[in-house]
Regions:
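Hydrophobic alpha-helical transmembrane segments of multi-pass integral membrane proteins
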Residues: 16, 20, 106-117
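Membrane-water interface at transmembrane helix exits
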Residues: 21, 25, 29, 150-154, ...
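Juxtamembrane interface at the cytosolic side of transmembrane helices
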Residues: 1-11, 112-160
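Membrane-interface interhelical loops and short interface/amphipathic helices
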Residues: 34-85
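Hydrophobic secretory-pathway targeting helix
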Residues: 1-34
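Membrane-interfacial interhelical loops
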Residues: 95, 153-168
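Individual transmembrane alpha-helix segments
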Residues: 68-111
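Peri-membrane helix termini and adjoining interfacial loops of integral membrane proteins
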Residues: 85-86, 121, 167-168
Length: 168
């Protein structure tokens, strides 16, 4: 294996966990996920009195906002049946931050997909698919290691992890 192939294999192994994580996040940000979650047995009642139908409606609108090109007015203009705004100013600021992070993640996710696909094409055309496959396998093991580390961090100090995540 040439040095360039070895470097590519290492890069693939490192990039794969990020691609898989972003793929999982993208799958969660789907209307069907809201349907499954809000209709799950034992899902807690809403403290503000929203019904499951209300939650699905407003959750769907909020998901739409994260993936469309609209400004914050898309959410700021949403009104509850009594005329009150759906989001207060603090929540709107948070949703804008989430949208910016999601939009950045989508761009990075697409870039990772292109890089991994180009690597696979190069490996296929260069007849080194087995080595490339081993790089994917190492990336898979690295992904499991990262998931394990995150789970340990959650068990040891959820509050710290939650705060650190929301500083991103």
């Amino acid at each position: 294996m040439t040095i360039l192939r070895k470097i590519t294999a290492v890069i693939v192994s490192i990039l794969l966990p990020f691609f898989l994580l972003m793929t999982a996040i993208r799958l969660v940000f789907q209307p069907v996920f809201l349907q499954v979650e809000y209709n799950a047995p034992g899902f807690p009642e809403d403290p503000y009195g929203f019904t499951v139908e209300d939650r699905l409606k407003w959750g769907g609108i909020s998901l739409d906002y994260l993936f469309n090109n609209a400004g914050i007015s898309f959410l700021a203009d949403q009104r509850l049946p009594d005329g009150a705004p759906l989001y207060n100013e603090r929540e709107l600021g948070h949703m804008l931050d989430v949208k910016n992070l999601v939009q950045l993640m989508l761009k990075v996710w697409l870039g990772l997909f292109v890089m991994l696909a180009l690597g696979l094409i190069w490996a296929w055309r260069g007849d080194w698919v087995p080595e490339f496959g081993r790089a994917y396998a190492r990336g898979g093991w690295l992904t499991l290691g990262i998931i394990g580390a995150i789970l340990i961090a959650i068990v040891v100090s959820f509050d710290w992890l939650f705060t650190a995540f929301h500083r991103i």
